[in-house]
């Protein structure tokens, strides 16, 4: 199934825009409003899964927390394992950590050391691509474990924030179902 313009517009219409959240001047794209509509949520999962069904994906990685909401069902639809990437101290087995820069300070993500096998073909899934920092750190974790990143897939892209260019500089192909102008 290839996404039609009508399907993508349907998804876009089911993502609410909240002005001045979390601070003045920001237009927050609320993907949780899409989750409230079973037909829109199911369509988003099916469109992502359909795109990657023949790609030889062996693992889907989702980043905390909304990446879990889309990554796990995509993994299930593809018949492959799902691997969560989380904030420090949230995973019970031995982990690998990767820190990355934020606008003010740093953050860290962790993955189980045994979650990705050498040469696993990995699809990363998250709800939104903004600056790309989270997915850049996730890519470094996957590569440190020997995995091969096939693509990074998102529900929403905010092109003005430069995330896709940042990830393409790391040889990461990006795919988003919808994009919104602004930030």
Swiss-Prot record:
Entry's Gene Ontology molecular function annotations: adenine binding; adenine phosphoribosyltransferase activity; AMP binding
Record-annotated membrane-spanning stretches: none
Domain of life: Bacteria
Subcellular location per the Swiss-Prot or TrEMBL entry: Cytoplasm
Keywords for this protein: Cytoplasm, Glycosyltransferase, Purine salvage, Transferase
Any GO CC annotation of this UniProt entry: cytoplasm
EC number assigned by the record: 2.4.2.7
Listed CDD domains: PRTases_typeI
InterPro entries assigned: Ade_phspho_trans, PRibTrfase_dom, PRTase-like, UPRTase/APRTase
Main location: cytoplasm
Matching Pfam families: Pribosyltran
Pathway: Purine metabolism; AMP biosynthesis via salvage pathway; AMP from adenine: step 1/1
Catalyzed reaction equations: AMP + diphosphate = 5-phospho-alpha-D-ribose 1-diphosphate + adenine
SUPFAM superfamilies: PRTase-like
Cross-referenced PROSITE patterns: PUR_PYR_PR_TRANSFER
Disulphide bond pairs: none
GO biological process terms held by the UniProt record: adenine salvage; AMP salvage; purine ribonucleoside salvage
Summary of the function given for this chain in its UniProt record: Catalyzes a salvage reaction resulting in the formation of AMP, that is energically less costly than de novo synthesis.
Assembly mode: Homodimer.
UniProt similarity note: Belongs to the purine/pyrimidine phosphoribosyltransferase family.
UniProt-recorded name of the protein: Adenine phosphoribosyltransferase
Gene name of the record: apt
């Amino acid at each position: 199934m290839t996404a039609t313009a009508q399907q993508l517009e349907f998804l876009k219409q089911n993502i609410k825009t909240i002005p001045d959240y979390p601070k003045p001047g920001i237009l927050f794209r609320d993907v949780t409003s899409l989750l409230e509509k079973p037909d829109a949520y199911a369509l988003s999962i099916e469109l992502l899964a359909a795109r990657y069904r023949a790609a030889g994906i062996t693992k889907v990685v989702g980043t905390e927390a909304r990446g879990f909401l889309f990554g796990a069902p995509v993994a299930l639809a593809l018949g492959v394992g799902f691997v969560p990437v989380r904030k420090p101290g949230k995973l019970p087995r031995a982990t690998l950590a990767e820190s990355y820069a934020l606008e003010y300070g740093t953050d860290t993500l962790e993955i189980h050391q045994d979650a990705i096998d050498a040469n696993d073909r990995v699809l990363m899934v998250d709800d939104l691509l903004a600056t790309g920092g989270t997915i850049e750190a996730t890519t470094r974790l996957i590569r440190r474990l020997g995995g091969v990143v096939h693509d990074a897939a998102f529900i929403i892209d905010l092109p003005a924030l430069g995330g896709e260019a940042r990830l393409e500089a790391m040889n990461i192909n990006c795919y988003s179902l919808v994009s919104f102008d602004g930030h």
